[in-house]
Amino acid sequence: MNDVSKASLPKAIFLMGPTASGKTALAIELRKVLPVELISVDSALIYRGMDIGTAKPNADELKAAPHRLLDIRDPSQAYSAADFRRDALAQMAEITSAGRIPLLVGGTMLYFKALLEGLSPLPSADPEVRSRIEQQAAELGWEALHQQLQEIDPVAAARIHPNDPQRLSRALEVFFISGKTLTELTQTSGDALPYQVHQFAIAPASRELLHQRIELRFHQMLASGFEAEVRALFARGDLHTDLPSIRCVGYRQMWSYIEGEISYDEMVYRGVCATRQLAKRQMTWLRGWEGGRWLDSENPDRARKEVLQVVGAIAD
């Protein structure tokens, strides 16, 4: 698409960053001075009843800056990148038609990628193939199936944990149905995003600072009642660690503590480590991301001014 046709498209803003980088705080500040509406791009914030461990914006923050695509699923339900793209496009169209600018804020980079580039059509689920995979898993174990995926699609195998049966099963299913790997199919993009997108990435200048922020926030979550939140989910009786919701960082480790598998101190240690690993994966995405302007989260005033310098002109 040439520059002239791009300029005729409606505007949108991406504010991306690793966990605990200050994305939400900056987005709320920007909403005070720009004609924007916020859309959450976070695979954990979609779940109802999961507020503390996901660092969901609190009531005062949401009153000042409402976020769309929060609390749209029960923790028992799945939500895919394709679901997100559909929902985000609908919200963006609604915001744009009201004369405002969509500001998409979050750290689920797969969602940003799906929205920006589109998704290739994947084969629909096949109950017979899925049943055969599950039977194999029952006989051989998911570790053996992960090894099978490693031979078929090493790129997907590196991204999917052996203890993630839902995604592991889907990757194998796609290959058995189509004869093509999940990696091969997802590299074929669908429809690109029909917006002129201004992209920003916010993070601390050093990894050590990010690690400090992560550890501090995890302890703040514990002090705010995170254990009670997860115990309430545990008490429902219908949730388990194969669900994407309970595999969210922090929740998986607290769940293991509640089940008596690990000590409290081990839960804290593992929770902080898992969050750091998540941030590392997010930063890897961002370093390879084209077209983003970097902002320093340790200097929020300067970050705000830098966004306004770029976005102020499009908002007039």
From Swiss-Prot:
Binding residues annotated for ATP, in chain numbering:
G17, P18, T19, A20, S21, G22, K23, T24
| Cofactors required | Mg(2+)
Which UniProt keywords are listed? ATP-binding, Magnesium, Nucleotide-binding, Transferase, tRNA processing
Indicate the secretion signal residues.
none
Among its keywords, does the record have DNA repair?
Answer: no
From the UniProt record, list the reaction(s) this protein catalyses.
adenosine(37) in tRNA + dimethylallyl diphosphate = N(6)-dimethylallyladenosine(37) in tRNA + diphosphate
Region feature (Interaction with substrate tRNA): 42-45, 166-170, 247-252
Q: Which residues form a coiled coil?
A: none
E.C. number(s) listed in UniProt: 2.5.1.75
The family database entries (Pfam families) matched by this protein are listed as: IPPT (PF01715)
Q: What GO terms are given for molecular function?
A: ATP binding; tRNA dimethylallyltransferase activity
- EC top class, in one word? transferase
Sites annotated Interaction with substrate tRNA? T108, R130
Query: Which BP terms in the Gene Ontology apply to this protein?
Result: tRNA modification
Annotated residues for binding of substrate? T19, A20, S21, G22, K23, T24
| Annotated function | Catalyzes the transfer of a dimethylallyl group onto the adenine at position 37 in tRNAs that read codons beginning with uridine, leading to the formation of N6-(dimethylallyl)adenosine (i(6)A).
Which NCBIfam families does the protein's record reference?
miaA (TIGR00174)
The record's comment on protein family reads: Belongs to the IPP transferase family.
Q: How does it assemble?
A: Monomer.
Q: What's the protein called, per UniProt?
A: tRNA dimethylallyltransferase
Q: What is the lineage of its organism?
A: Bacteria, Pseudomonadati, Pseudomonadota, Gammaproteobacteria, Enterobacterales
